[in-house]
Amino acid sequence: DVEGVPAALYDSTFSLQKDVLYYKIREYAAACRANKMEETAMEASKVYYTDFRCPVGTSLLDKLRRVCIAAGIKDIDMDGKFVAIKMHFGELGNLAFLRPNYAKVVADLCKEQGGLPFLTDCNTLYPGSRKNALEHLTCAQLNGFWPMTTGCQVIIADGLRGTDEAEVPVPNGEYCKTAKIGRAIMDADIFISLTHFKGHESTGFGGTLKNIGMGCGSRAGKMIQHAAGHPEVQQSLCRGCHRCAKECGSDAITYDANNKAVIDQTKCKGCGRCIGACNFDAIYSQCDSANEMLDRKMAEYAAAVCAGRPCFHVSLVQDISPNCDCHCENDAPILPDIGIFAS
């Protein structure tokens, strides 16, 4: 339960943000462990960790390689197999996304084992530089992701318009029976997620699960996950700046005679971009259960992506910005850099 974290992320004092986020993460991790042990009786995977301290002669890239090897990436049979490395290429203007140097370390490890790696992501629901494959590829290149820097190609998994998808079953799905995933991701023999931890206006925070569950969904898949609830406007707080309307990819926001924002619920897709766009906290989710439902659907989508094939996960806890890398800006980190996790 991450209730309360989104509001804290918008608070003006970083000390409050840090305290709330820290304890919510602890609560969430404890609940996950308890749920996993009690309901599924599964043994938790070992997670390997290294900090960001680097003695002379050792780089962060060296440490990333070592922690990946320690966590077992070389135990995966990759010979002649396609390896999807799922990551976020960053919206243009955002500088909190993972550097392409990290992607090259993972891609090189795959190639050393005979694998055929490619970097991948799916298109977005909202306006920006990643709403179709052509602009998405241009964005990735401008942010440094191309073969000369990463050692492998970039493929936008759900195609030109975000409609190239595979509908796959969700194992024991309670909220989604099937998941609509970018086809190139499901065509891969092996799946690797490469992400960094950060805040998020709807889910509280985002990391590996969000990178997989929401990130691998096609446009239709993203809409299904967001469909649990739509935002509303507290008009007394609205300043009529029109930022929310510029961010809306569904043309769902108009303005009344008093220049106050109004959301057409029949057009709204529930993506939450307007919530992050508003600097005055005038737009909010109708109920906490909507975000809770989003979290659960996202987890089920992640399960569908990973089921039935070898998977490996890398999460760098650095550049912990208040919002996700989908924004065209990034605020100062709300926590110091911590380290690298791999499993």
Write out the residue ranges for each language-model feature.
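Hydrophobic pocket-lining residues that define ligand/cofactor binding sites across diverse proteins
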Residues: 110
